Structure formats: C-alpha cells, structure tokens
Regions:
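C-terminal segment of classical bacterial N-terminal signal peptides
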Residues: 1-5
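Residue-level detector of alpha-helical hydrophobic segments embedded in or interacting with membranes
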Residues: 6-9, 146
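Acidic, serine/threonine-rich low-complexity disordered tracts
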Residues: 10-113, 155-231
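Acidic/charged, solvent-exposed loop-and-adjacent secondary-structure segments enriched in E/D, K/R, S/T
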Residues: 117-145
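Extended non-catalytic interaction/regulatory regions in multidomain proteins
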Residues: 147-148, 152
Length: 231
C-alpha cells in the first residue's frame, strides 16, 4: 500500500524556531480527551493490526499552575507500555515524564535547561540522569502537543528542540503542506521530520486540534499507520 508519504514533499521554506513559552504557542488549543488509536502495518497488499494506543489527556491544576496531564498506554501485546507526562499548559514546558515498559523504567524531572531522573531495567538499580542543556527543551514524547498548539496553516514551518533520553537534545521540524478530509474532519496535513530521511505525515483537525492520523515508513516496504478510532 502506498501511503501519503509517497505523495507529500516537505518544502524547503524557512522555519521559525519555537521554544517553551513562545508567544505563538497556545496550550488552550489542547482539550481534555480520551482517544483510542489503531496501529496497523501495511506491507504491499497485506495489512496487520499490531496493537492499540489509548491516549488520555486531562487538564488539571498543580497548585496555581494549569497543566496538561497525559497518560498514553500502548499495547502491542500482553505487556503494555505506559507513558505519563505533565506539561505546563501556559508555556508547553515539560515538568515530569514517567515511562514504564516490560524492559525499562524512565523517570524525568524538567526545570528549564536542567533534566534530572533515572533510567534502567525495571528489576535492577537504575542509572541517574542529571544534565544541564544548552537551551530549555520540550519533551520528545509530547511532540504532537507542541505541533497541535502552534498556529498551523498552509506554508507554515517550525523547528523545535526536544530532550530524548537516548540521544539527548534533538531538533524536530514541521511543514504544513495543505489540508485534507480525514475521518470526516477537515485537517491540516503536516510533514513531521525527526531527522534526515526520517519523516511522518501527520493529520491534525483544524477545529478540534485532535491528532487524527500518522503515517510513518518504518522500512522501504512497510508503512505504519496510527489512526484515531471514531466512537
């Protein structure tokens, strides 16, 4: 099956650099929600459902700070991955991140440029993390919250830097290439670039700002589609 990645080309337009607290970010664009996605792999004419993802977003107050509390549960088999994050709704700056899988436990605390926490197997003492970065990052696990909070329109391009436990400080880029109707909703079509030759096509609802669908080529012949399930 030929996905949208084969038809979309990210233009080489200048991209603005966005950081936590940027005035163009609007955390109010993110609504409380509970969503289930199907994860389907396409290889040629064959397709296989490989799992589901349940994404729960709550808008809460932590003291006098409004936050976005997100819990993402990915179930590719019997042992799910559970990813929990807390993000400042005013600035989209990350505050906390906890990731639990059968093989690894990650805990992170963000405070501007400083990141502290631990990483390691679930059944042995973990390795400490304590680093001060060149700039205050976003959380790589919440890339879509950042994108959904931006002023998306055709021709818009942005870069933003994230912290990733495996590779440290990284830069992501988005290019809005147009619009399409997905799941009965008008959506922005966004090219999301993680690294050279690593791209996904993302569909984000124009009015709802929901993440509707993501397509990623995971090898030369296989596409992974994450698609929102309509209830």
């Amino acid at each position: 099956m030929r996905g949208a990645l084969g038809a979309q080309q990210a233009p080489a337009s200048p991209a603005v650099l966005v950081a936590p607290g940027d005035t163009t970010l609007r955390g109010s664009r993110i609504a409380a929600d509970s969503v289930q996605y199907s994860l389907v792999a396409y290889r040629g004419a064959q397709q296989q459902t490989i799992g589901t993802a349940i994404d729960v977003v709550r808008l809460e107050m932590r003291g006098d700070v409004p936050v976005i509390h997100r819990v993402l549960t990915v179930s590719p088999g019997r042992a799910p991955l559970i990813d929990s994050t807390v993000t400042d709704a005013r600035t989209l700056a990350p505050r906390r991140h906890r990731n639990v899988s059968p093989s690894r436990l990650i805990t992170l605390e963000f405070n501007g440029r400083r990141v502290k926490g631990s990483i390691g197997p679930v059944d042995v003492p973990s390795l400490p993390i304590d680093t001060t970065l060149a700039i205050a990052p976003f959380d790589s696990g919440n890339w879509d919250l950042i994108v959904r909070s931006l002023p998306l329109e055709k021709g818009y391009a942005a870069r933003f830097r994230v912290y990733d436990t495996d590779s440290g400080l990284r830069e992501y880029r988005i290019d809005v290439t147009g619009s399409a109707t997905v799941l009965g909703e008008e959506a922005h079509v966004v090219i999301f670039t993680l690294a050279p030759k690593r791209e996904s096509v993302v569909w984000i609802g124009k009015e709802s700002r929901r993440l509707l669908q993501v397509e990623t080529m995971i090898d030369a012949n296989t596409m992974l589609r994450q698609e929102r399930q309509v209830r």
